[in-house]
Amino acid sequence: VTEKEFTYDGVTYPAGTMIVSMYQAKRSVANGVLYDGTLINGWTILYSEGITSFNETRGFDMVAVAEPAAYKSISAVCGDAMDHDDALAYTKALTSCFTGDKNKDVILSNASEDSTAAVNELLKAGKTVGMVTSGDHMGDFICSYADYQTVAGKYLLSAAGVDKTSVKAKIITKSPTVYVPGTPAESEKGFVYTPQISQSAGWNYDTAAMNLMGFTTTSDVTKADAAAGATKLDAAAKTAVKNGLPYIGYSYSAASSASDLIAGVEYTELDGAMDCLTPVVYPNKTLVNASYIADGDDILYAYGLGYFSKVPASATVLVKSDK
């Protein structure tokens, strides 16, 4: 990790930049993980090659350095080399980033599981949190500096102190209880939770994701403030959504059944295709995608390669492949 800023190819990189040396015994492993990947556009279907552009799928910036002279100047500002235990200790010591004025109000960047979990914790504690509705921070959260301090040490947050009079926001009334579809029945023999652990991947992943973000979950749709998940909705959940329950559905099971909920929707899946990285555009800026737009997230990972080939004229398209 660099201890001072340095300049390479006209770009200045700050202290704290991670450097992975190719002068090590396992350099091929590191290069295999970090190289830019292989673009194959001559085949319409490809299963055997996994996506290797980890910087794009995992969300970090990466630059390859191939000039010996630059190795020396960059190495000169690096700290000691780290092994696995050192890396774990380093990440454990990371703290939230705060800029701007203290003792005013705080913009929390809506950029991670931690930011959502922090907001949910504040809401459950009866604190006031808003979502910014316009301007450069549209889609981010805002709270008091005192409330920010109660969660800053528990989560990794990007925050900026601001004068609230310059920010337009809508108060979030509560931390929503989320219905996760597809709750498996308990086993009648042996370990009762076997279906949940080993036979219900979609439900399991969704439940884990909601827990990571601090949401309370329920298997009873009548007790939910929203629904989200990869499993197809049952009859009761469909009725609730049609009656106005907010719903986030993804995966083939959910997307292919969208026509059951909304007239005029058609879903198309490329036969045999698996996944891809695709450039995207955002046709409409809303509170749902504003933080993606602000962060310049113009490449997204797609699993399953299904897409909505037709939507109603009244629909708001949030993201679109720009192939």
Feature locations, PLM:
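Intrinsic-disorder/low-complexity accessory segments
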Residues: 1-323
